[in-house]
Amino acid sequence: MYAVIKTGGKQYRVEEGDVVRIEKIEVATGESVDFDQVLLVANGDDVKVGQPMLDGAKVTAEVLEQGRHKKIKIVKFRRRKHSRKQQGHRQWYTAVKITGIQG
């Protein structure tokens, strides 16, 4: 059984037991969180697709950690002008473990 959820402006395909890094949400480590924006639920050949969301479906997860991704470098370079700009960015994430899918 798997589901497609929407959180943080992105969509994730999740199964029970998966550990997923999503955009940061303000929930303490060890607490449970419910995702009610479920786009699709599939159980074998039984597939339910929402338009755009499924009513009554939800995915529950446990927060494992809050952290930051690896640093990415942003470089702006102007040729022949002896000008360049370099910047780094580390995006915050929340790691969650999917504990249940209902729907």
Curated annotation (Swiss-Prot):
This protein binds to 23S rRNA in the presence of protein L20. GO terms for molecular function: rRNA binding; structural constituent of ribosome. NCBIfam families: L21. Keywords: Ribonucleoprotein, Ribosomal protein, RNA-binding, rRNA-binding. Belongs to the bacterial ribosomal protein bL21 family. The gene is rplU. InterPro entries: bL21-like, bL21-like_sf, Ribosomal_bL21, Ribosomal_bL21_CS. It comes from Alcanivorax borkumensis (strain ATCC 700651 / DSM 11573 / NCIMB 13689 / SK2). Part of the 50S ribosomal subunit. Contacts protein L20. Pfam families: Ribosomal_L21p. GO terms for cellular component: cytoplasm; ribonucleoprotein complex; ribosome. The lineage of its organism: Bacteria, Pseudomonadati, Pseudomonadota, Gammaproteobacteria, Oceanospirillales. This is Large ribosomal subunit protein bL21.
